[in-house]
Amino acid sequence: MIQKETNLVVADNSGAKKVRCIHVFGGTGRRYAALGDQIMVTVKAAVPNGVVKKKDVCKAVVVRCAKEQRRKDGSYIRFDENAVVLLNAQGEPRGTRIFGPVARELRDKRYMKIVSLAPEVL
């Protein structure tokens, strides 16, 4: 469950390390984002000479969420941290590598590029 002001880890090599959620897409009063949902983030910490800089605002998709989420088969999926992958205007990942596992829900939401770059899909 990601909401405004939530701090997240970036799971790609776009140059950002830590980001903060500033908006949840998907309706006027939508409060929470879960696995596979798009959010607007601002970069709070970045590596030098990266693609994105500190204070940049960009879209991101949630790939790991600490709050458990129920699946269709009745099982639950939960991760140790909240993590996102930064997206460009076309919805493609800005980085060329993904670090750590990603959730299977991204395949259902048609983020095939992220799923193919990820080392593990849970």
Curated annotation (Swiss-Prot):
Binds to 23S rRNA. Forms part of two intersubunit bridges in the 70S ribosome. PANTHER family: 50S/60S RIBOSOMAL PROTEIN L14/L23 (PTHR11761), LARGE RIBOSOMAL SUBUNIT PROTEIN UL14M (PTHR11761:SF3). HAMAP family: Ribosomal_uL14. One of its GO terms (cellular component) is cytosolic large ribosomal subunit. CDD domains: Ribosomal_uL14. GO terms for biological process: translation. GO terms for molecular function: large ribosomal subunit rRNA binding; structural constituent of ribosome. It comes from Chlorobaculum parvum (strain DSM 263 / NCIMB 8327) (Chlorobium vibrioforme subsp. thiosulfatophilum). Part of the 50S ribosomal subunit. Forms a cluster with proteins L3 and L19. In the 70S ribosome, L14 and L19 interact and together make contacts with the 16S rRNA in bridges B5 and B8. Disulfide bonds: none annotated. The lineage of its organism: Bacteria, Pseudomonadati, Chlorobiota, Chlorobiia, Chlorobiales. Belongs to the universal ribosomal protein uL14 family. This is Large ribosomal subunit protein uL14.
